[in-house]
Amino acid sequence: MKKVWMVAAATSVVLGLSAQDSGVETQGIGVVIDAHALVDVVNDEIVFDFSADDPTEAGAAFALGTNKDQNTHLNYSLMLSNGGLADGTISVRISDMNEGMHMTLLADGTPAGTLDPNAYGKLGTVAANFDATLTTTGVKLTNADQILIENIGSSYTGDGAGNGYQLLYTAHIDDYSKLDADNGAQDMGTITYTITE
């Protein structure tokens, strides 16, 4: 019985010594951030209203007036899941455009370019062919995805009008013979923006 008691006492002393605090302590911490990719256009719908552009003289053509140009802003939030490689993109495509017409697009990244990268992250750059600071010729939108913004890192643009990237749309007539009147209704097309990494 004495031997069992001595072993128990020795074990208690050793365990007691190893559980004591010291002058230095470390603690592990964990951080969990979910990857996310969100994109938004400030106006869910833009209407190109040409009802005031009817010709007033017989033999004159219907021509698109000042409403052929519209603009809005694109906002996004992106948290990369690939170790921080700034390879995010936003692509654009169009579907169901009015027959006889097409849409061109330019983007101005100046508002996003003024944001502090320490606060907003690694914001993307407008692809050169879409960049309104480099060209005045818009890119014709098609039903195939085209890269609009590239090299996006973990970042966000701010929300609402005046934040992010200004989008500059222009409507054009392709084939006059395919145009038709809507008599107060509107043909609806869809422009789709997709953010990926």
Summary of predicted features, one role per range:
Residues 20-141, 145-197:
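N-terminal small/polar-rich segments of proteins
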